[in-house]
Amino acid sequence: MPLFFSLVLLILGLHCAPPNSCEGKITSCLSPQQNATLYKMSSINADFAFNLYRKVTVETPDQNIFFSPVSISAGLAMLSLGACSSTQTQILESLGFNLTDTPMAEIQQGFQHLICSLNFPKKELELQMGNALFIGKQLKPLEKFLDDVKNLYETEVFSTDFSNVSAAQQEINSHVERQTKGKIVGLIQDLKPNTITVLVNYLCFKAQWANPFDPSKTEEGSSFLVDKTTTVQVPMMHQVDQYYHLVDTELNCTVLQMDYSKNALALFVLPKEGQMEGVEGAMSSKILKKWNRLLQKGWVNLFVPKFSISATYDLGGILLKMGIQDAFADNADFSGLTKDNGLKVSNVAHKAMFYIGEKGTEAIPEVRFLNQPETTLLHPIIQFDRSFLLLILEKNTRSILFLGKVVDPTEV
């Protein structure tokens, strides 16, 4: 049962700015039914994910990367509800939306359906996206904003005394720990005294492989090439089974799809040696659609490392480079959130945790492993023994739940 956790933290600091107004009628979440807007959003969100990924690689070259694009998108879209004028426009355009083609109400309705679809109960798949908004007691949020974040983003809103920094920090950390079932502890360690609003977005995902690995076939101490001069030893899971896979000769990479038991899949992308940057630069929603069209099922002699990684990012600088500038400036316009005093974003933190194994963190009762063919010489060998990309997708919405690069699987 691979287990994933993601958390987006948006911290807004108090500052003075003249109030303004913004309008837009928002509907409430009625059902998880998908629509044309949702499918349109999947491509837009995917391109945002890869654009963000490329910015992260510049900031953290040659390191493990792991984050939840859909969590970040939802957190920023939710923030845009309280933004107005160019502050709102920059947030939405950085996400890939053109307000001329897609009105604000349609964008928010799309996220409404996305969150409803992701949170809709599914057998054998635990998937929950959640939000929490901690607002300073001295702040008077607009009723419309509170209604919208509750109806659209299923957000809990808490009135918090930020004048007591340690107590506010404990309140937020305790909430996050409860919601992630103890997987994220002590998230905030240095809450700033001028903080007045904290927005938390998290995504919890737990699923069982459709075809679990046999632990007895895991090879301890297998070599994994980190770079030309560095090799580490990792447990390497092994299985001979039928998988959807392909060799993309244009991008010089091998793609393998591993299905979960219900409504989710993992894409493992293995570039040829020296071709990682080329693959990273080409990733897009169009590439995903091409792979989805060309993947074919066949026998594979598969080797995948067993590992866990976690990553924490301050996305403020990256989002600035992606076009979100006013939100961090003194002229930020969040008059859609409150008429008291304006706000500006002081920090955007994101944390994601990842574990993958034969059965995961919990035992799977009565797992039966199918007999594998003795002769494997004719089956192609796909061995993830060097840096590779990893995508976790939800099938119904085609949303990228998680996106990452494994450079060193021994780094936790």
UniProtKB/Swiss-Prot annotation:
Keywords: Glycoprotein, Secreted, Signal. Glycans are attached at N35, N98, N164, N252. Residues 1-16 form the signal peptide. Gene3D superfamilies: Alpha-1-antitrypsin, domain 1, Antithrombin, subunit I, domain 2, Serpins superfamily. This is Thyroxine-binding globulin. Thyroxine binds at N292, K395. Major thyroid hormone transport protein in serum. PROSITE patterns: SERPIN. It is found in: Secreted. Expressed by the liver and secreted in plasma. InterPro entries: Serpin_CS (IPR023795), Serpin_dom (IPR023796), Serpin_fam (IPR000215), Serpin_sf (IPR036186), Serpin_sf_1 (IPR042178), Serpin_sf_2 (IPR042185). GO terms for molecular function: serine-type endopeptidase inhibitor activity. The gene is SERPINA7. It comes from the Eukaryota. Belongs to the serpin family. One of its GO terms (cellular component) is extracellular space. Transmembrane segments: none annotated.
